């Protein structure tokens, strides 16, 4: 039994490793094997070609997508740059337009304010006489109304005017300035007080008796120095004040004061216009300040 088992085992291994010789194949078997090998080779080549084509197409697509993406990114960057520059230009243009509009609006407002001021200050237009024939009753009514208005619009008593004379010293010359002021003004009161102080001094100097020759020399020198001090108390006048005084006297002599005032109130009068606009700005600031303070209070 042991021998039989060993033989069977050896024969089974031989069967597995057994390869028939070429003479044992028939022609049909050989042809079928060759065909199968060719078919397998063709399938493998087709598969390799297909995989290569797929890989090449994928790479081409990736390259195309990469190129497109790069081109798109470049276009987007260019669009962003152009958009940024155009937006900056638009912002600058809008800023300039707003500045011009605000300047024009400010000038227009100033012109309107100045025109309204001139209309209020300017001479009133005379009412043309009416051609309507008045009856007796109408004339009585109008006369009575005029009387009532005249009683209501009685002018207050005009204050008295006083002419005062001031003496100035300009470059060693005595300049006298005559001014007409109200009697109740501070300037007039100070002028009267100064005159009252100077009168007793002049009386004292005139009532001094003549003294002897020996003692008169010393006393005369003392009195002359005192009188010199009194006379030397002259207010000095500067060149600007002298030129202003000359200009005022020239306007009075020529009678052009009213004409100059009307001209200065016109559109060409820069000083009057500037002063008026400054007053308007100051008043507007005060109104805004009062509003802010009223809102801040609880």
Curated annotation (Swiss-Prot):
UniProt keywords, alphabetically? Centromere, Chromosome, Developmental protein, Isopeptide bond, Kinetochore, Methylation, Phosphoprotein, Ubl conjugation
Where does this protein have compositionally biased stretches of type Basic and acidic residues?
98-112, 148-158, 191-200
Q: Cross-link of type Glycyl lysine isopeptide (Lys-Gly) (interchain with G-Cter in SUMO2): positions?
A: 149
Q: Which residues carry this modification: N6-methyllysine?
A: 218
- UniProt-annotated location(s): Chromosome, Centromere, Kinetochore
Q: Which GO terms describe its cellular component?
A: kinetochore; Swr1 complex
| Compositionally skewed regions (Low complexity) per UniProt | 205-217
Q: Which residues does the annotated region (Disordered) include?
A: 1-158, 191-223
Residue ranges of every copy of the BCNT-C domain listed in the record: 217-298
Q: List residues, modification Phosphoserine.
A: 82, 85-86, 116, 215, 249
Q: Describe the function of this protein.
A: May play a role during embryogenesis.
Tell me what this protein is called.
Craniofacial development protein 1
What organism does the record attribute this protein to? Muntiacus reevesi
Lineage of producing organism: Eukaryota, Metazoa, Chordata, Craniata, Vertebrata
């Amino acid at each position: 039994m042991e021998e039989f088992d060993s033989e069977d085992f050896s024969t089974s291994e031989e069967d597995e490793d057994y390869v028939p010789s070429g003479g044992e194949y028939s022609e049909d078997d050989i042809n079928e094997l060759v065909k199968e090998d060719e078919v397998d080779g063709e399938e493998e080549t087709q598969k390799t070609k297909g995989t290569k084509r797929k890989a090449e197409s994928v790479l081409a697509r990736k390259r195309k997508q990469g190129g497109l993406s790069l081109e798109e990114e470049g276009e987007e960057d260019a669009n962003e740059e152009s958009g940024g520059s155009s937006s900056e230009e638009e912002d600058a243009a809008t800023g300039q337009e707003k500045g011009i509009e605000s300047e024009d609006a400010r000038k227009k407002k100033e012109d309107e304010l100045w025109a309204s001021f001139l209309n209020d200050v300017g001479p009133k237009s005379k009412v043309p006489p009416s051609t309507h024939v008045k009856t007796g009753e109408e004339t009585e009514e109008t006369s009575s109304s005029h009387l009532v208005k005249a009683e209501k619009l009685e002018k207050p008593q005009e204050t008295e005017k006083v002419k005062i004379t001031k003496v100035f010293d300009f470059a060693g010359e005595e300049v006298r300035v005559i001014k007409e002021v109200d009697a109740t003004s501070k300037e007039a009161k100070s002028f009267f007080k100064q005159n009252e102080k100077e009168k007793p001094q002049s009386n004292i100097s005139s009532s001094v008796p003549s003294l002897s020759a020996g003692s008169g020399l010393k006393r005369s020198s003392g009195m002359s120095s005192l009188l010199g001090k009194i006379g030397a108390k002259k207010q000095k006048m500067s060149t600007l004040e002298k030129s202003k005084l000359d200009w005022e006297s020239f306007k009075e002599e020529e009678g052009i004061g009213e004409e100059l005032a009307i001209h200065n109130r016109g559109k060409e009068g820069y000083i009057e216009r500037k002063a008026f606009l400054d007053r308007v700005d100051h008043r507007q600031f005060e109104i805004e300040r009062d509003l802010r303070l009223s809102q801040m209070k609880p």
